[in-house]
Regions:
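A short, hydrophobic beta-strand element within the central beta-sheet of small alpha/beta folds
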Residues: 55, 59, 76-91
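Short amphipathic alpha-helix used as the core "switch/output" element in two-component signaling
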Residues: 64-74
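Conserved beta-loop-alpha segment that forms the PLP phosphate-binding cup at the N-terminus of a helix
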Residues: 212-236, 240, 246-250
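Acidic, metal-coordinating helix/loop segments flanking the phosphotransfer/catalytic sites
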Residues: 37-53
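Conserved N-terminal alpha-helix of the aminotransferase class I/II PLP-enzyme fold
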Residues: 172-222
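N-terminal "arm"/small-domain region of PLP-dependent enzymes with the aminotransferase-like
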Residues: 101-194
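Short hydrophobic/Thr-rich beta-strand motif most characteristic of the beta2 strand and flanking loop
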Residues: 30-38
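Conserved acidic segment of CheY-like receiver
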Residues: 2-26, 55, 252
Length: 252
């Protein structure tokens, strides 16, 4: 997720030259730059390309109208408005809740601005990542070693044979490094519902408007059996569809 859209050019040197410098600085930071034709083109791109991580635009030309339209698609997406010293700032407290930052058109400031945009991008990715996923990403990134899990030692064991290398290349290193068990305390406990597991369950409940949510293993089948055994104790009379999922048959 490294795509930043720039709205422009504007046909005047004092705006286009700083943005040109910024484009080079952003590329050096590892970003991919795109130039939408207009606001409609930009909104369609955001709608169909969730990998975009920021939009740069001229405040005098687009102002809050564009921000509001983007917010309808992604309220967390960082927006970078460039202004001149005479720009009119008509922003309410409600508007400031947007992920909106302001910069002035200035030569020689591109590197510093690009670094700040990298920081804001990292904050954006951190904000949209669910708790357990974030903890798992951190665990893999830190390249920690556990004696008992995973048994294949982050995938290195697969690279001892030609067919093992094919398997490793197919799934990728992160898949195997993230293959961990309950012994990894940094990820909390699925049995005790603690740590990132608990945070994830609370996050799921908030997302779906539930009072409580639980993460279980073995997919929908096990989930159905757990709910069914709670809702229909021994001796209950059940009426189920003939073509129901096999998990309900297992429940019976």
């Amino acid at each position: 997720m490294n795509i930043i859209a720039i709205m422009g050019p504007h046909g005047v040197f004092y705006k286009d030259e700083p943005i040109k410098e910024l484009e080079s600085a952003l590329v050096a930071q590892g970003f991919q730059i795109i130039w939408p034709q207009n606001s409609v083109d930009l909104l369609k791109f955001i709608e169909h390309n969730p990998r975009i991580c920021g939009v740069i635009f001229d405040w005098d030309e687009y102002s809050l109208d564009l921000c509001s339209d983007i917010n309808q698609l992604n309220e967390y997406l960082p927006l970078y408005a460039f202004i001149n010293t005479h720009s009119t700032m008509d922003v309410s407290v409600q508007d400031m809740r947007m992920a909106l930052w302001f910069f002035e058109y200035a030569l020689g400031q591109a590197e510093d601005i690009a670094i700040r945009m990298r920081q804001y991008t990292n904050e954006y990715l951190d904000n949209i990542t669910p708790p357990f996923t974030k903890a798992l990403f951190t665990y893999v990134k830190e390249r920690k070693y556990t004696f008992c899990t995973p048994g294949h030692m982050g995938g290195t064991a697969y690279q001892k044979s030609p067919v093992g290398c094919l398997f490793y290349d197919f799934f990728g290193g992160n898949t195997l490094k993230a293959d961990v068990s309950i012994s990894v305390t940094e990820l909390g406990s699925l049995l005790d519902h603690t740590g990132p597991h608990l945070e994830a369950e609370e996050y799921i409940a908030r997302t779906f408007g539930a009072e409580q949510s639980y993460i279980v293993t073995n997919g929908t089948s096990t989930s159905n059996k757990i709910v069914g055994m709670y809702a229909a104790p021994s001796g209950s009379t059940l009426l189920i569809d003939r073509n129901c999922h096999k998990s309900l048959a297992h429940l019976l």
